[in-house]
Amino acid sequence: MHNDIKDFSWVGSQENFVDKINIQYLNHIIVGRYGGNSNAGQYKNEDGCLVWFNEKEDWEFVMVLDAHNTAESAERVLELLENEKGHIKHLLSMAAIQKTFKMLEAKILSMFQSTEFLAICRNVKGETACLIVVRKDKYIWWFSVGDCVLYLFHSELSTFGQYQVNQRQFYEWIGQVNTFEQEVHCYSVGIKELRQGENRLFLTTDGLIECPNEPYSNPKNIYNAFVNCKEEESIKTMFQNIQENNVRDSTTIISWKINILKETTIP
């Protein structure tokens, strides 16, 4: 039986999954974690993730984090989101109109820019990349600091070679070194309409992309991994491939399918 509401969060300091592939379903959402190879020198995991969803209200709110030095910065971001969960979920319950996404953007920014959170960040060791993705109705909204990636896989977009939604940004972080402490705050936000039919959303930290021999540096290879294959098997195969290529960095994946029945923009 599917639950209408489910909340999940994890950070690598809780369980590191070094040498261990872990894949689990949260209703229709699949979360995959691999902590890297110990024989490549890995001994810790500083990734994190969060999943909220409500089927009745037709939304998902997910986040991946990729911290370095320690997992402290990822832990603080997860705590921040948890503290503001009620307000964020209220916004997500509203209609999928321009104003709703603008209010969500303003809320997320105000959280990261708050005096209290900035003071907390000054006392952590290390910093994190952060990618938040919201799917509401036939739209996705994203907020990104750093180099985590969101892909949108759809056959119509694949025809044009379009897979990646956000641009990876290096030298952006939240934590001890903090983009929101700078004179100008650097981050990326965007909204995109999904296509009619089956859309797959796929978030990942950089371990998958920067693996030795680069089996998945081309997003088309990730797209193809899901063709004629169950999603759990697809993600397991990706983890096995990076494991065999002796990846050191950890990888955290969140992925799910959305079938859009409504008409979408077309000339």
Located regions from the model:
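PP2C/PPM-type serine/threonine phosphatase catalytic domain
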Residues: 1-267
